[in-house]
Design a protein with these regions (language model features):
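Compact nucleic-acid interaction/catalytic patches
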Residues: 1-4, 8-39
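C-terminal terminal-subdomain/extension
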Residues: 40-89
C-alpha cells in the first residue's frame, strides 16, 4: 500500500480533481508556498505547497479532508498562482 500524502485541492470537475503536492520540505522555487498557518490547517508539521507540481486525480482516491487554508495562506496561494504558475489548459 502506498503512503497517504496531503494535497491541496485546486479544482474539482465531475469525477476528477486537480491538486498540488504538499511536502514538509522547505520552499525551493518562487512557485512554492510555505504555509504560515500549517497547524490550524490540519497539518502535523510545517509544510510547503508545490504549486508547480500539479496532478489530476480521480475523486475516489481522496480519503478525507484534513483542513482548510487560512485566509492569509489562501491569498498568498492565489498571488503565487497568478504571478508564478499561470498554467495553460
Amino acid at each position: 500500500a502506498s503512503k497517504l500524502r496531503p494535497i491541496l485541492v485546486l479544482w474539482i470537475d465531475a469525477a476528477d480533481v486537480v491538486v498540488a503536492a504538499v511536502t514538509s520540505a522547505a520552499p525551493r522555487s518562487p512557485a512554492d508556498l510555505f504555509l504560515q498557518d500549517w497547524s490550524s490547517e490540519g497539518l502535523r508539521v510545517p509544510s510547503t505547497v508545490r504549486l508547480s507540481r500539479l496532478d489530476c486525480l480521480e475523486q475516489t482516491v481522496l480519503r478525507r479532508r484534513l483542513g482548510r487554508l487560512s485566509e492569509a495562506d489562501a491569498r498568498r496561494a492565489k498571488h503565487i498562482w497568478t504571478s508564478q504558475v499561470q498554467p495553460r489548459f
